[in-house]
Amino acid sequence: MFIKNNKVMKTYTFSKSFIIIMFTLSVFYIPLNSQSPKANPALDERVKQFLGESSGQWRDMNVPTSDGQLLYDIIIKNNYKSALEIGTSTGHSGIWIAWALSKTGGKLITIDIDEGRHKTALENFRKVGLSEYIDARLADAHTLVKELKGPFDFVFSDADKDWYKNYFTDVEPKLKVGGCFTAHNISDRRGGSSGQAIFLEYVKSLKNYETTVNSAGGGVSISYKKAAK
């Protein structure tokens, strides 16, 4: 009788220990492929200070802070590493994108056709300490986007709106599955024949893309690429 009870106690103890171990693993389990953003407090402080001091100086061709934060969050959340920006302007959105990439270990290619804006952007990237994460090119995006080899996992389009669909179709084959194509100044309420409306209608029709529009700032379409069925 004593031996039988001892076996029961051993079985009970083992079961209880197993349950505790499994519960602990379920609470503290971290996926093997996940990576925490790289910490760089000095760079973070430098970027925040620059963005704060420059907040009232950006031209209309730059994104508002809320949209910059949105782009940053998308990159961090998905651990993107290879980004393309079409339309650098003077560097506001590029700073947000490169700041995120500095944490994921990635790099940004950004394109602008205007020499003045390009030079100003280069200076802003230097001031903020993000130059090593940015490959800024003075070029015609109509041509260069086609020539870039990729692959990319994040794209932000903020150049000539009538060319949005063309930019998308040129870069789409180079966008990884799970990657994200974003475009600025997009609204669900904007119909008609504008470049933004034509682009949005087209990308929403694609079965291997999931597209939403964030209207909090200047309006950003967010299109995630899914595996083709």
Feature roles, as predicted:
Residues 2-19, 29-154, 161-229:
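A short alpha-helical cap/connector motif
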